[in-house]
Swiss-Prot record:
Keyword line: Aminoacyl-tRNA synthetase, ATP-binding, Cytoplasm, Ligase, Nucleotide-binding, Protein biosynthesis
Protein's UniProt keywords contain 4Fe-4S: no
Entry's family note: Belongs to the class-I aminoacyl-tRNA synthetase family.
Pfam families recorded: tRNA-synt_1c (PF00749), tRNA-synt_1c_C (PF03950), tRNA-synt_1c_C2 (PF20974)
Alphabetized PROSITE patterns for the sequence: AA_TRNA_LIGASE_I (PS00178)
Annotated motif 'HIGH' region, positions: 41-51
Organism ancestry: Bacteria, Pseudomonadati, Pseudomonadota, Gammaproteobacteria, Lysobacterales
Single Gene Ontology MF annotation: ATP binding
Keyword Cell inner membrane in record: no
NCBIfam families cross-referenced by the UniProt entry: glnS, PRK14703.1
Compartments reported by the entry: Cytoplasm
Record's subunit section: Monomer.
Name assigned to this protein: Glutamine--tRNA ligase
Binding annotation for L-glutamine: 74, 218
Organism: Xylella fastidiosa (strain Temecula1 / ATCC 700964)
Length: 580
């Protein structure tokens, strides 16, 4: 795994997107002397490719400016969260090549958040409301109609404080009361119409157990967690732009830098205390065609067994992309290539695939394999003919060294490399025609062997002994070159040919009454059984190769071993997707 360090990041060409420009200005004007960002996922599912953009931005910005990035689990909704998700998130961030300066949980700050809520109550800025969720929606109003104040909006601070403490004591059932901010029920921004700060949920928490029957709402917890951790720039996607006034309201009215007594619970835990006045900045989220990235829809794909789990190589989770053979370097290159802006757009899936091709072309050793094998017998060689040929591991990188490749009288070739009735421009095998066998010489087809049904089952041919590389006959011109695998030495392998999960660019488009389920690509996974050269089998899981003329493949993360090789196709050699 490649690791991104501050030195590495600072050595890269200067990036000039609007977020980095803001940070440069803040540093130049003395607004901040150091940069501190955070990546705050909720541990209620697996990270997907959209999160990769946020991870690269949050950690990348911190590294570029010599700062820090905190990984924070936003664990305020315990009924949907799981320690397994939290562990997977840490694994994914590390896999991408990033390291956090501290691992935190919003639950680490529950005592501080509670004290902050009591401060707002005492200041007359928050009240306990008895409206249920349906009534709250009715009172909130619409985009064109002002909301109505709750009947309990004018409770006294003393009464509110007593009720809030009873909420914490577990006196009331779920959903019967909330703590709400007292802001403006006529605001044009619905997020400011007395939003909830706390709700009652008698649910056991993965970190705090049954200590808390109340939990803070996202906007309140997120803003104050940023301030508690000393975050300088809170980077969010555009859907949080309308939440920014509430973010600022929470930070300004709690005012942690001037109310240090609220941080005492952190002192008792030994946590650092350097509260800040963070600035929220929004950027466009990542949208890619041929995908869905809604957590609800991804969960449905798994629960309905439309895919084979969260790490199915067709999924757009980081776990799935990793198993497919995507590399951290390719993911980071993709994020760099699409850039950072405030304009929502849809990125073509081919951009992601091309980033992987570009990376693997540089690093992946070459091997030979056949995925639709057919026998070629070179009849002018002895039946026991066997030799070892020397092949480079990479044609453009001598540092990757060489390997020995066995060669014999009987070879496996690709069935698609032979045609009895070739189309115009055909450059491969035909009856009586010649082709160059990669690294072994020129072969001529003398006989086509068929079964009783008339299907071709084997070819018999002749190898020109003067056409080996380095011999005079090697310069004789033939139209095509094909790959092969020595049949006696070949290792049988399971090869999984993956393609796009959806068959149309916008699987989320429900205008004709269909859903994304109706657009699943029936050819997104095909399993074939082929043959590979021995050097491809003797390798660990998650090792990438270019199978010459076939594409880039990776040994499966879970199912591969030397006795049962399993390869996943990561990407074809070129974009062959047929668009409508």
């Amino acid at each position: 795994m490649s690791e991104i360090t501050t030195t590495d990041a600072q050595a890269q060409p200067e990036k000039k997107d609007f977020i980095r420009q803001i940070i440069r200005e803040d540093l130049a004007h003395g607004t901040h002397t150091h940069i501190h960002t955070r990546f705050p996922p909720e541990p209620n599912g697996y990270l997907h490719i959209g999160h990769a953009k946020a991870i690269c931005l949050d950690f990348g910005v911190a590294a570029e400016f010599g700062g820090h990035c905190t990984l924070r689990m936003d664990d305020t909704n315990p009924s949907k969260e799981d320690p397994a998700f939290a562990a997977a998130i840490q694994e994914d961030v590390s896999w991408l090549g990033f390291h956090w300066n501290a691992l935190r949980h919003t639950s680490d700050y529950f005592e501080v958040l509670y004290l902050a809520a009591e401060k707002l109550i005492a200041d007359g800025k928050a009240y306990v409301c008895d409206l249920n969720s349906q009534q709250v929606r009715e009172y909130r109003g619409t985009l064109t109609e002002a909301g109505r104040p709750s009947p309990w909006r004018e409770r006294s601070p003393d009464e509110n404080l007593e009720l809030f403490r009873q909420m914490r004591a577990g006196t009331f059932p779920d959903g019967t009361r909330t703590l709400r901010a007292k802001i403006d029920m006529a605001s044009g921004n619905i997020n400011l119409r007395d939003p909830a700060l706390y709700r009652i949920k008698h649910v056991e928490h993965q970190n705090t157990g049954n200590t808390w029957p109340i939990y803070p709402m996202y906007d309140f917890a997120h803003a104050l967690s940023d301030a508690i951790e000393g975050i300088t720039h809170s980077l969010c996607t555009l859907e949080f732009e309308d939440h920014r006034p509430l973010y600022d309201w929470c930070i300004n009215h709690v005012d942690l830098p001037n109310n240090s007594h609220l941080l005492k619970p952190l002192l008792d835990k030994g946590f650092p205390q350097e509260p800040s006045q963070p600035r929220q900045i929004e950027f466009s989220r990542l949208n890619i065609n041929y995908t869905v990235m809604s957590k609800r829809k991804l969960t449905a794909l798994v629960d309905e067994k439309l895919v084979e789990g969260w790490d199915d190589p067709r999924m757009y989770t980081l776990q799935g992309l990793r198993r497919r053979g995507y590399t951290p370097a390719a993911m980071r290159l993709f994020v760099e290539r699409i850039g950072i802006s405030k304009q929502n757009s849809i990125i073509d899936f081919s951009v992601l695939e091309n980033c992987l091709r570009e990376n693997l072309d540089t690093i992946a050793p070459r091997r030979m394999a056949t995925i639709a094998p057919m026998k070629l017998v070179l009849t002018n060689l002895a039946e026991d003919h066997e030799e070892q040929l020397i092949f480079p591991n990479h044609p453009k990188d001598d540092t990757q060294g060489t390997r020995t490749v066995p060669f014999s009288r009987e070879l496996w070739i690709e069935r698609d490399d032979f045609s009895e009735a070739p189309p115009k421009g055909w450059k491969r095998l035909i009856p009586g025609g010649e082709v160059r066998l990669r690294g072994a010489g020129i072969a001529r087809i003398d006989e086509v062997v068929k079964n009783a049904e008339g299907h071709v089952i084997a070819l018999h041919g002749w190898l020109d002994p003067t056409s080996r590389p380095g011999m005079e006959g090697a310069h004789r011109k033939v139209k095509g070159t094909i790959h092969w695998v020595s049949a006696p030495h070949a290792v049988a392998a399971e090869i999984r040919l993956y393609d796009r999960l959806f068959s149309i660019e916008k699987p989320d488009d429900n205008t004709d009454g269909k859903t994304y389920r109706d657009f699943l690509n029936p050819d997104s996974k095909r399993v074939v059984h082929g043959y590979i050269e021995p050097a491809a089998a003797q390798t660990a899981p998650e090792h990438a190769f270019q199978f010459e003329r076939l594409g880039y493949f990776v040994t499966d993360r879970h199912d591969h071993d030397a006795t049962h090789p399993v390869f996943n196709r990561s990407v074809t050699l070129r974009d062959t997707w047929q668009r409508d």
